[in-house]
Amino acid sequence: MKNIRFGIVLYIGLVISNCAYAQIPLFKQFPQCREHIPYISLGSLPTPIGPLKSLGAALNCNSLYIKRDDLTGKKTEEFQLYGGNKVRKLEFLLADALFNHQAKTIVTFGAAGSNHALATAIYAHELGLNAILMLKDQPNSAVVRHNLLLDRYYNAQLQWYPDNETRSSAANKLLKEASKAYLIPTGGSNSIGVLGFVNAAFELADQIKTGQISEPDLIYIPIGSCGTAAGLLLGMQAANIRSHLICVIVEPEEKQDEFLKQIKKLFVEINENLHALDASFHLYDFPEDQLVLNKKFCGPSYGVLIPEAADAITRMQQTEQIRVEGTYSAKAIAAIIDDASSGALEEKTVLFWNTYCGIDFSHLFEENDYKQLPAEFQSYFEGAHTEVKNY
């Protein structure tokens, strides 16, 4: 039965994909890339841009906007699927898995409540693929528990690992032994996944041209695996967007020196790949003058809610009725609040790129469903992990 469903879903995906090929902004601009880069339309794109009027008024930032990647989830007859920024990457990653590798199983990494791992599980399931999520510990929260239960709902196989070394060793063993398994790195941030945000920059350029927003002076994003930053930065060069990209780092201080290096690495690699496919995609110097790494809101360790993020969650909910979360998106809002408090955003056009899907999917599961999770993950529901408040 699953193979029949897989064939039907894949056929539908191919039909949709072929239609979408001619429509996505990256392929419109560089049609030769279309001939070589697999793509499946998974999300509801383009995502809208709208003003954050109430929050902007409170911050004395009257041109504050939001890019609604919380709404990337594909809409079905029943409800809207989980979204967030990872859907953009998965449109290229899962296409590569299917068309170039004939994959049947998708393997990826994350923390216990990883939004990336969850999105991978959901869209792999939609394409009839198995998903194995190799997860590590993180501070407990309602978001973590919500995501774990959604992982289970979409039939993902969850595996717990105490550290990166053990997990990497297990992944290497799995890939050698499993038939047609395809590995997606943490955050989907490799030269394939990051194409989703090169394309997103052209999507933004189209929205600027049609008057949905003036070219932003500043674009705020949270960054972890650096793919969103690298893709946007490269796409901005090709689309001639001169905005400054404010990347709010979410990892602890000891890892911060790695971020610029990783963004540069991905930028150069993807730029060279695209130029090789279509010579009209120029080779660009790395634009350090457009990139700002904000290190003020990283917190003591991954997933720990800092006071500034808790305040940002409350403000967004009270002023705009939009849910953000404390690990990533709220830290970008916290940076906007901080910069606005110094007057730095007066007379500026500011865009907050919301990477988090804040839709509540708890109607899909029962709280007691956690007992069907592997034992290591049941502990998040039984008080064995320190709770992060105000998520």
Q: PLM ranges: what are they?
A:
Residues M1-R5:
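Positively charged n-region of N-terminal signal peptides that target proteins for export
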Residues G7-S17:
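Bacterial N-terminal signal peptides
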Residues Y21-Y391:
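PLP-dependent amino-acid enzyme catalytic core
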